[in-house]
């Protein structure tokens, strides 16, 4: 097994390929990509034996923007016999001897064509899990050091990749997709983007400390209030900045103040630092990056989650430019900061970015 399979949104295979090629090279790992447009996954084959496993251990999954999941795989199994699909899969795993495995996930790419396989995948998981346990596998806790999850990626009927991923360096979600329910009281479906962003970027154990009823937030381009809703739900008082109307249900909470202003011109009150800045405005990504940079550098906010709408072409390059700009500006000012970005399931032609400023470096 010396390949990586990376799941992604259909249509973003080239961005995923460019990113894994760059990140692998930074670790001294080289290889080539096999991809099919709109397939929802890519294969990165390493030149050196053992390098795929090294990437699965050392390349931090949270650093990948476009990948929803990252697993080590071998050659594709094709034309699995209908009367016994399990034996060829077990045979591939026997070469690995995954004694430190915790569970099995039988998945597909997130495409309309592949989704037709999901019913089969669910049914197939039960006998496969039983067979793997008979081999003495799937016995470890997923929290055990060095434990791995076993993953099968069915790309079409009878054809699959057999693989694994380390539990401390992968998405915890089936197919890399969190299953979120749209709250009936939320003003718009965009609320799911911020909910997924918080789930992705903020450790669950820290969420109640990072969002409290003593905090204030600003939502730039807030109307009708999908993102504001997520902050208010967590107790934050929000200045909702937009010329449009906010949902009446949000006004009724008493936890928002509507500021009918231009999001690019709005400034917080002097000597008041905002805890959370959120922004989901439709604008050129570099213009949004400069706006967010201004808020952080001026000390107007401590933490921010925002979306960057991507162009039709050179999307990965545009992301690199925007993130490099923000990192460079914050470095110039001597800030300690953490920056993460992800192409979330609820994002479309956009990515979501999180930046937390932790103070300034000593001079």
Swiss-Prot record:
Catalytic reactions on record: cytidine(2498) in 23S rRNA + S-adenosyl-L-methionine = 2'-O-methylcytidine(2498) in 23S rRNA + S-adenosyl-L-homocysteine + H(+)
Gene Ontology terms, MF aspect: S-adenosylmethionine-dependent methyltransferase activity
Xref: InterPro entries: RlmM_FDX, RlmM_THUMP-like, RNA_MeTrfase_FtsJ_dom, rRNA_MeTrfase_M, SAM-dependent_MTases_sf
Keywords associated with the record: Cytoplasm, Methyltransferase, rRNA processing, S-adenosyl-L-methionine, Transferase
EC number: 2.1.1.186
Cited Pfam families: FtsJ (PF01728), RlmM_FDX (PF18125), RLMM_N (PF21239)
First-listed, main subcellular location of the protein, grouped into a coarse class: cytoplasm
Subcellular location: Cytoplasm
Broadest EC class assigned to this enzyme: transferase
Annotated active site: 309
Highest taxon above the source species: Bacteria
Entries under HAMAP family matching the protein: 23SrRNA_methyltr_M
Function per UniProt: Catalyzes the 2'-O-methylation at nucleotide C2498 in 23S rRNA.
Family the entry assigns: Belongs to the class I-like SAM-binding methyltransferase superfamily. RNA methyltransferase RlmE family. RlmM subfamily.
Assembly with partners or alone: Monomer.
Protein name, UniProt field: Ribosomal RNA large subunit methyltransferase M
Gene expressing this chain: rlmM
């Amino acid at each position: 097994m010396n390949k990586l399979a990376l799941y992604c949104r259909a249509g973003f295979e080239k961005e995923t390929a460019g990113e894994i090629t760059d990140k692998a090279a930074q670790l001294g790992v080289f290889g080539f990509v096999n991809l099919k447009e709109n397939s929802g996954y890519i294969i990165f084959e390493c030149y050196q034996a053992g390098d795929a496993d090294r990437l699965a251990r050392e390349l931090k999954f949270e650093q990948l923007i476009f990948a929803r999941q990252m697993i080590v795989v071998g050659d594709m199994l094709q034309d699995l016999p209908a009367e016994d699909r399990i034996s060829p899969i077990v045979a591939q795993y026997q070469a690995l001897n995954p004694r430190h495995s915790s569970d099995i996930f039988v998945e597909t790419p997130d495409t309309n064509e592949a989704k037709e396989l999901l019913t089969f995948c669910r049914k197939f998981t039960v006998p496969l899990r039983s067979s793997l346990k008979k081999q003495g596998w799937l016995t470890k806790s997923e929290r055990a050091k060095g434990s791995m999850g076993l993953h099968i990626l069915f790309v079409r009927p009878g054809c699959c990749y057999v693989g694994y991923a380390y539990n401390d360096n992968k998405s915890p979600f089936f197919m890399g997709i969190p299953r979120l329910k749209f709250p009936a009281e939320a003003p718009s479906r965009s609320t799911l983007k911020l909910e997924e962003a918080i789930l992705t970027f903020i450790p669950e154990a820290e969420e109640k400390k990072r969002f409290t009823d003593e905090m204030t937030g600003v939502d730039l381009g807030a109307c009708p209030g999908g993102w504001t809703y997520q902050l208010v739900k967590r107790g934050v008082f929000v200045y909702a900045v937009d010329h449009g109307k906010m949902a009446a249900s949000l006004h009724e909470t008493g936890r928002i103040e509507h500021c009918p202003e231009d999001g690019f011109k709005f400034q917080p009150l002097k000597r008041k630092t905002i805890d959370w800045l959120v922004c989901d405005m439709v604008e050129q990504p570099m213009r949004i990056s400069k706006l967010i940079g201004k808020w952080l550098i001026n000390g107007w906010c401590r933490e921010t989650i925002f979306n960057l709408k991507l162009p039709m072409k050179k999307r990965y390059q545009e992301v690199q430019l925007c993130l490099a700009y923000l990192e460079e500006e914050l470095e110039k000012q001597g800030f300690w900061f953490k920056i993460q970005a992800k192409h979330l399931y609820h994002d479309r032609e956009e990515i979501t970015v999180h930046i937390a400023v932790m103070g300034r470096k000593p001079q």
